[in-house]
């Protein structure tokens, strides 16, 4: 594995002379016809091809690739099962591309599959992705009647300073091949995908952020890029800024000035009647006060529709920014870092489904790994005791209360309670508990103590007070509560989503029932 790591880092040691070099090329279709108006970039300069399909610009000192924004009318080109819209910059000056038209033309309807935080730290984690996530993604793609394209939302691996898991990047990349998951997957960098190994300082690596992204680039290609499907312009960007090179904790969510300028140029070639989707790792909801984030949100608001897709939090949330742009924050594919089958907010390991028609999102759902699409909620008794040998949290609400975790609920969803077959009333959304503090059950706690009870009480993660406990006591933005008229009644909770679909749960969890939380046990050989 170490050999793979060294080889990949060495592969990016290109053109480190620090002087600008002309980059030229021609873009044609498979019939040899030159293509005009194709957007080409090195991540800094943005230009388009002329009537003869030609482009030219001076490369930026820090640029590693030349690449194009894939037009909606052309197929996603694959290399070894992965999208490849780029070529590595070398001492050459000419970089030509050939695009293959889609047989049926532009795809008006398609599905985006959002995979947040696979976050593999070791071979067992990769094996769980291989055995659980990948086949589930493939099954979803097979069932979908429209073309499917996946997008990762960062933290492909779990590097953290001296705990360097970047050697797993080539392995997880292999598991993410289109043949393995049933669709091509575009990548977004996360804060745990950074390279903490020493990298030469110079014009090509002028900031900690640029130096730390080199391993990810070597494996997956450009960091800031765009592509088009139907009437949608899709952008992936790095939104992690590192303050120093030698401390993995010294980062914050934001965009650099260079990135904002690159995005401004990229969007200048997009018609205002299109929808723009921005894919990042850290939710922009976390950094709304940043001037560069506000600049990005302002640019996006100029289009007919705009959406943001993010991960990072290991919980599920829907958020609307002040300018009306909706952000989807997706639960992690790895849940609580593969220790269980659920995220810290009780949302199961899984991924998001975004269905698009024209320039509109026409449907959105969360798909739990290993479960049917209708698995959308879990119900608890208000006095239940959860956990295991490490700790046993008890809900303080009383036996006449029930709580429902509806992991993709929004304000336009209805959550109803039936007692003995008769409609009793609507559940009330609980006020979301803070991220820090609230580490034990209380009458004001909206957290999912069934999930927390498994991770802290059974597994023992974050059991002792410390910096990691909050990771396993995530806030829950979708917990509902109801007072039963008859605590002894047979209870059924019926959820109706914004499309009128109904999801039903008639099982109330009253204790440490953890068949759905416990991960499978695999025997993984050291060779694998």
Positions of the model-derived regions?
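Short, acidic Ser/Thr/Gly-rich low-complexity loop/linker segments typical of extracellular
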Residues: 44-56
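Binuclear metal-dependent phosphoesterase catalytic core
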Residues: 325-409, 413-422, 477-506
């Amino acid at each position: 594995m170490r050999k793979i790591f060294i080889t990949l880092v060495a592969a990016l040691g290109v053109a480190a002379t620090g002087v600008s070099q002309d980059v030229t090329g021609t873009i044609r279709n498979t019939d040899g016809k030159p293509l005009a108006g194709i957007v080409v970039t090195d991540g800094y300069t943005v230009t388009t091809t002329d009537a003869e399909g030609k482009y030219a610009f001076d490369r930026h000192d820090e640029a590693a690739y030349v690449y194009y924004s894939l037009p909606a009318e052309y197929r996603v080109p694959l290399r070894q099962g992965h999208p490849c819209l780029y070529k590595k910059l070398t001492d050459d000056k000419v970089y030509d591309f050939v695009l293959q038209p889609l047989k049926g033309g532009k795809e008006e309807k398609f599905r985006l599959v959002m995979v947040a935080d696979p976050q593999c730290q070791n071979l067992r984690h990769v094996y769980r992705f291989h055995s659980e996530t990948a086949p589930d993604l493939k099954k979803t793609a097979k069932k979908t009647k429209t073309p499917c394209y996946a997008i990762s939302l960062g933290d492909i691996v779990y590097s953290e300073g001296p705990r360097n898991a970047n050697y797993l990047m080539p392995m997880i990349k292999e598991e993410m091949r289109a043949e393995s998951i049933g669709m091509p997957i575009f990548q977004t960098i996360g804060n745990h995908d950074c390279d903490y190994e020493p990298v030469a300082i110079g014009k090509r690596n002028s900031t900690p952020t640029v130096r730390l992204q080199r391993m990810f680039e070597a494996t997956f290609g450009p960091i800031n890029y765009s592509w088009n499907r139907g009437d949608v312009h899709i952008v992936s960007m790095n939104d992690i800024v590192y303050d120093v090179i030698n401390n993995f904790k010294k980062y914050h969510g934001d965009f650099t000035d260079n990135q904002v300028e690159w995005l401004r140029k990229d969007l200048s070639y997009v018609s205002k009647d299109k929808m723009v989707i921005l894919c990042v790792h850290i939710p922009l909801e976390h950094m709304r006060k940043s001037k560069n984030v506000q600049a990005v949100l302002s640019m996006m608001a100029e289009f007919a529709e705009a959406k943001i897709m993010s991960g990072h939090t290991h919980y599920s949330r829907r958020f609307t920014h002040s300018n009306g742009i909706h952000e989807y924050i997706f639960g992690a594919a790895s849940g609580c870092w593969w220790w269980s089958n659920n995220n810290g907010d009780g949302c199961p390991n899984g991924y998001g489904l975004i269905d698009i028609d024209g320039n509109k999102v026409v449907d959105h759902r969360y798909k739990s790994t290993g479960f049917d699409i209708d698995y959308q909620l879990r119900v608890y008794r208000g006095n239940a005791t959860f956990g295991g040998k490490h700790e046993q949290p008890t809900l303080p609400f009383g036996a006449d209360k029930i709580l429902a975790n509806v992991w993709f609920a929004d304000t336009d969803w209805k959550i109803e309670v039936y007692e003995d077959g008769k409609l009793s009333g609507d559940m009330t959304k609980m006020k979301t508990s803070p991220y820090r503090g609230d580490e034990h059950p209380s009458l004001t706690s909206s957290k999912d103590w069934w999930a927390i009870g498994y991770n802290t009480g059974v597994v023992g993660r974050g059991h002792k007070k410390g910096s990691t406990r909050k990771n396993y006591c995530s806030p829950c933005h979708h917990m509902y509560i109801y007072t039963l008229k008859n605590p002894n009644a047979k209870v059924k909770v019926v959820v109706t989503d914004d499309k009128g679909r109904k999801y039903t749960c008639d099982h109330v969890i009253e204790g440490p029932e953890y068949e759905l939380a416990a991960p499978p046990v695999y025997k993984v050989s050291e060779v694998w």
